[in-house]
Amino acid sequence: MNSDLALLRLLQLASPGLPVGGFTYSQGLEWAVEAGWVRGVDSFVGWQREQVHDTLACLDWPVLARLYRACQAEDAEAFGHWSRFLLANRETAELRLEEQQRGAALARLLDGWQLGQAPAWRASLELTQLGGMAWLAAHWAIPLRQLALGHGFAWLEGAVMAGVKLVPFGQQAAQTLLRDLGADLPAALDQALALGDDQLGGGLPLLAIASSRHETQYTRLFRS
């Protein structure tokens, strides 16, 4: 696949129109606002920046790299291992369910394209969204670094759009946040790709508490 077509496929994977429900989740932000932990743009920046340097850099991106390489090597066993590892590291029932729902939605898209149908792969593809993204990226010859940055920007965009509704702040502030927080991604990715297997894993106690409390929050805009 030529580089132009690979870029277009990456834009498709990173698009908010990808039918995986990306804008239906707040990943704990809704409770963080309710509790007063996030009160404005500055505290929102702190909330998201911690996730960039912990969740993305120490868990999601290193696992994405391993999933991608497993696809390139046609190693379904390794792919299944890292898919289960990622799911096990989602710290709350809400976050695990979100991951599985996103993964199942992307697997259904693959079904519609008659891709990823081999039994050795299909069950693992349903577990996480990252698994489906890695599989498609390897299939479409999207370079790993571009895949990770596309995934990171899509995640960041979803968080900022949730912030528009919840914090709240306006569209000008939202675009400024995407510009400024997005500038953190390349260096965080360098860190992520340098980690060994025994260094993987993230943990943000306030995020876990916020997600747990969101499960029973009385008034919610976002899915649990």
Curated annotation (Swiss-Prot):
Annotated compartments: Cytoplasm
Keyword Cytoplasm in annotation? yes
Gene3D superfamilies the record matches:
Urease accessory protein UreF
One cellular component term (GO) for this entry is:
cytoplasm
Pfam family name, one: UreF
Q: Which GO terms describe its molecular function?
A: nickel cation binding
Key word Cell division present: no
What keywords does the record list, in alphabetical order?
A: Chaperone, Cytoplasm, Nickel insertion
- Protein family: Belongs to the UreF family.
* Function description: Required for maturation of urease via the functional incorporation of the urease nickel metallocenter.
* Subunit comment: UreD, UreF and UreG form a complex that acts as a GTP-hydrolysis-dependent molecular chaperone, activating the urease apoprotein by helping to assemble the nickel containing metallocenter of UreC. The UreE protein probably delivers the nickel.
Protein name per its UniProtKB record: Urease accessory protein UreF
Q: Which organism is it from?
A: Pseudomonas putida (strain ATCC 700007 / DSM 6899 / JCM 31910 / BCRC 17059 / LMG 24140 / F1)
